A protein has these predicted regions:
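Acidic (Asp/Glu)-rich catalytic clusters
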Residues: 50-53, 77-86, 119
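C-terminal beta-strand-rich structural cap/linker in extracellular carbohydrate-active enzymes
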Residues: 274-294
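Solvent-exposed beta-strand/loop surfaces of large extracellular or lumenal domains
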Residues: 253-278
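Aromatic/acidic polysaccharide-binding cleft in carbohydrate-active enzymes
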Residues: 4, 84-177, 206, 218
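Carbohydrate-binding surface patches
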Residues: 187-249, 289
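Active-site neighborhood of glycoside hydrolase catalytic domains
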Residues: 1-58, 64-75
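Acidic-and-aromatic substrate-binding clefts and catalytic sites of carbohydrate-active enzymes
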Residues: 42-49, 63-76, 99-109, 136-137, ...
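Conserved, mostly hydrophobic/aromatic
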Residues: 57, 119, 212
Length: 294
């Protein structure tokens, strides 16, 4: 339900709804121990109480205008990690092109793909498909916006990618920082958080692999995941960017994969390593490319 004003029980005594979440979940699990449970932390409301029960299967966060920035998504994932003892993944209920959906039209593909790219790269997932259509409002039967054939195809690639590389995307790991630069001027790079006019990197160490996500904000007209009016511009395709990154450990293999290219299939790349600097050429970046160093 999210945040409400002061609430009262039948006898007129104030009730802290959020503090009641835990006992509600505990009682439900006790009554139905064989059932899987999930509870919606609307705008983060009650997320700590929900997660600390240890009785839900994943976090479910319905996010709204008060959490409209891409940085808010990462903050939610961090908090949920703490609340769930780093054992639970997060699903965002996040309605795209919300204002545009007041009238009939078509989803804005660039906005959808950039948001999914960020959510997936950060380790989250996105509840955005309901029945036979994409969700644009909290009233799920709303079908004012339709998906183009391009978007339908892209959704298959993005969810195939999320599934194929789930161990790298959603199976823990330690966030770190990898210094990276482009030596032929094909892209401007910055480390998380995102900047307009730039390609943002987000890095994690996952087991014996160093993972670096490239997220393309080069053409972005805002840093809001919601793309409420459906105006996010299409990202320009970047090809053959000469990249260097500082890695002290010996590199045995370097590969990339993207839901925007080759159906998400990995491509092993040639590279050189000298004095802790790894040099290679990135085949392409549209919205999201994942670099994996072994």
């Amino acid at each position: 339900m999210g945040r409400r004003s002061t609430l009262y029980n039948y006898n007129g005594i104030p009730v802290n709804l959020r503090e009641g979440y835990a006992s509600f979940i505990e009682a439900t699990k006790q009554a139905h121990p064989d059932k899987s449970l999930v509870m919606n932390a609307v705008s983060r409301y009650g997320a700590r109480q929900i997660g600390e029960t240890g009785k839900v299967d994943f976090f479910y966060n319905e996010v709204w205008a008060d959490e409209a920035d891409f940085t808010n998504l990462k903050a939610i994932l961090y908090e949920n990690g703490v609340y769930g003892n780093y054992q639970l993944n997060t699903v965002f209920a996040a309605y795209m092109n919300y204002n545009k959906a007041d009238n009939r039209g078509e989803f804005n593909t660039p906005g959808i793909l950039l948001t999914d790219a960020v959510m997936f790269a950060l380790g989250g997932s996105h509840l955005e498909l309901g029945g036979d259509h994409m969700l644009c409002k909290e009233y799920f039967p709303n079908e004012n916006l339709t998906m183009s054939e391009e978007l339908k195809t892209a959704m298959v690639h993005y969810y195939d990618f999320l599934t194929s590389y789930q161990n790298l995307l959603r199976d823990g790991g330690t966030e770190n920082s990898v210094s990276m630069n482009c030596t032929n001027g094909e892209m401007r790079l910055n480390s998380w958080p995102p900047q307009q006019g730039s390609v943002t990197t987000y890095a994690k160490q996952v087991g014996g692999k160093q993972v670096i996500h490239l997220l393309n904000f080069s053409q972005a007209n805002s840093l809001s995941w919601r793309d409420v009016d459906g105006t996010m511009p299409e990202a320009a395709l970047i090809t053959k960017a000469a990249l260097q990154m500082n890695l002290s450990a010996k590199v045995n293999k370097l590969w990339v994969a993207s839901p925007d290219a080759h159906g998400g299939a990995l491509q092993e790349l040639a590279f050189t390593q000298e004095n802790g600097v790894v040099s290679f050429t990135l085949p392409s970046l549209k919205y999201w490319t994942m670099i994996v160093v072994e």
